[in-house]
Amino acid sequence: MLHFGGFIMEINHISKILEKEREEYIRNKVEEYLKQGFSKDDAVNKANQSWRTYIGHRIQDVIYNLLKKFLKDSGLKVTTDKALNNRNLPEELDKVKRLIAINYGEYLFLPDADVIVYKVENNDIKIIAIISVKNSFRERRFETTYWKLKLKESPVTSHIKVFLATPDKDNEISYKCPNGKPKKMRIILEYELDGIYFLKEDFEETEKAKHFGKIVEDIIEISKKL
């Protein structure tokens, strides 16, 4: 029997680590830009821009490593779109890449698949879920929903679950109707995707919007049905 308390504790602990890391990162970057001759305001702005780029990749790495660690005993495997974009892939990852590719006539493209979970049984690969990691929703707000709809078009990929994982620091999608005003983005994302997982405690939980600590159990349950 699997226990997920440790996973939830690690998620909550990592959120605190990332916040502390942000303070140190911004401070160091501001000092770096000041030495380069930028004004204080410009240095702060550039440091914040640099952090937004950095944190997106950092959160993806955190999620990948946590899922790899906690899904290992279930026999499930985890990879990333970054790994799939490498040349000379091993046979297994090459098959994974082909099984999530979307056909555009003579072209094939990978969806927004930051993290991919799959299983191998009797040399047969089955894609279980794709996890899109978003730190901010200022740009490409509905990119993940677009890929979900494209995956549903083909019988080869229609079974793949598409999840969104986010810390949503600015509360852009944390609540459906804050102050009685419907949040279009939250409502559409929740409706179209198979699940939204928050890397924080303060959000409106529903059947499809949960704490990220529950994603391992959900993925394992889905894998049993495939």
Swiss-Prot record:
Q: What class of enzyme is it?
A: hydrolase
One family from Pfam that matches here is RE_BsaWI
Q: What is its EC number?
A: 3.1.21.4
User: Which reaction is this enzyme known to catalyze?
Assistant: Endonucleolytic cleavage of DNA to give specific double-stranded fragments with terminal 5'-phosphates
GO annotation, biological process:
DNA restriction-modification system
Q: Give the top-rank taxon of the lineage listed in the UniProt record for this protein.
A: Archaea
GO molecular function annotations of the record: DNA binding; type II site-specific deoxyribonuclease activity
Keyword tags: DNA-binding, Endonuclease, Hydrolase, Nuclease, Restriction system
Instruction: State the protein's purpose.
Output: A P subtype restriction enzyme that recognizes the double-stranded sequence 5'-CCGG-3'; the cleavage site is unknown.
Task: Please report which protein family the annotation says this sequence is part of.
Answer: Belongs to the BsaWI type II restriction endonuclease family.
Protein name as annotated: Putative type II restriction enzyme MjaVIP
The uppermost taxa in this organism's lineage are: Archaea, Methanobacteriati, Methanobacteriota, Methanomada group, Methanococci
